Amino acid sequence: MCIRDSYKLPPVSLLKQGSSLSTSKKLLQETAKDLTQLLKEHGVEAELTNVVPGPTVTRYEIELAPGVKVSKVTSLSHDIAYALATPDVRLLAPIPGRSAIGIEIPNRQRKLVSLGDVLSSSEAAKLTHPLNVGLGLDIAGKPRLLNLSELPLSLIHI
């Protein structure tokens, strides 16, 4: 009898869960309003289409009006950071696969993501391979998991 066949993983309930902080809708709306006002003040015609709060940053997605250059928004990164009183702003221009620009602004209160959060998710429950690993949460708060045996040049063999 092989040890691998008789071994059972410990229950996920033993793992610590992270804090349940969530960004308030009021704060998200205020930041969205400040952001759209700033763009308007700099002559950028754009529409806020989506707000994606994550554990450490919130992505504000905007679509530019026809004729507005993406470079006009990307050149405003320091002005956006200054206006929102944040040390850094990241711009995704464009968001891959979409005709929108993502403006990622750090949350004032960051959520601690623990391994328990990732491995107790419904996505992790669907996986049965013994070499699945929880990596963390993506910007949208969705669990990111990886099967080590599927990695190229992996030295792990079962």
Language-model-derived ranges and their functions:
Residues R4-P152:
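N-terminal "pre-motor" subdomain/linker immediately upstream of P-loop NTPase catalytic cores
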Residues M1-S6, I156-I158:
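Conserved small/polar residues in nucleotide/adenosyl-binding loops
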